[in-house]
Regions:
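Catalytic core of pol beta-like nucleotidyltransferases
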Residues: 1-26, 35-40, 51-99
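Short hydrophobic/aromatic beta-strand micro-patches
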Residues: 47-49
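Hydrophobic alpha-helical positions that pack around
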Residues: 29
Length: 99
């Protein structure tokens, strides 16, 4: 099982590629990993913002999710900050650990 620190280090090293290839402006971890409640089979919840959100289509989003899963070697649940549901937004933003 990966630790939060291992995931943070990997995401930090991927930031240049995330920015250049996928237009990712910010990346953070929320959910069970940010709360220290992850289990052996937990996925990692990743919150992103894009520098040009209107230029990102569904295929780009899926490609980013697959890229992160492959690089981190763990299932990724990817969420775009602007797509957060109102009822969950405050909680998620409070617990997000930005890289």
């Amino acid at each position: 099982m990966k630790t939060l620190d291992e995931i943070k280090i990997q995401l930090e090293s991927l930031k240049p590629v995330l920015k250049d290839k996928f237009q990712v402006e910010t990346v953070g971890i929320f959910g069970s990993y940010s709360q220290g409640l992850q289990k052996h089979k937990s996925d990692v919840d990743i919150l992103v913002t894009f520098s040009e959100p209107n230029d990102i289509d569904l295929l780009d989003f899926i490609a980013l999710k697959q890229f992160l899963s492959r690089k981190l070697k763990i299932k990724v649940d990817l969420v775009e900050k602007h797509a957060l549901k109102t009822r969950l937004k405050d909680r998620i933003l409070k617990e997000t650990i930005y890289v």
